[in-house]
């Protein structure tokens, strides 16, 4: 589970928040799956919308919560959790009724989560190539914090890849070659899912959980 230490968090106000809070963006794939998951489990939460199109994720306020500048972020009674798949696992453990990650399917679901996580860059490439309004491509992207992101007191290597994406996006955007490669990779995985759905109502069987 990726739970941030208090010393990793610069926006200290969230440490005193009570209840469950979710920082999210309407059209973020990772935000959408988290909202769907919470909806299926009937989890009440306070939402905080971060507009990625306006680069609000690069604001000092949000980078003070998660230097990775990514949504979603879950705050539970002042504890900050990042990475959507880890958030799903955390919530399923915290609210065990109507488990969506049942023990008898946990290994298979974990493997699917790893595969899905590996597709994040492809999803981002396609999103920024085809869905981000063209006029925003001409807007100067607010600079990411100069300070290195830390995770559990150590430099966050995951943030290096995130920075590299934004640096390349500022310079050349998403090229046709990159977008095509990402689309083909996504199609490959979606075809595999469609094949499973020809035999079952859901990916892992005829029951949701």
Feature names for model-found ranges:
Residues 1-157, 163:
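GST-like domain detector, emphasizing the conserved glutathione-binding G-site
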Residues 121-209:
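GST-like fold's C-terminal all-alpha helical module
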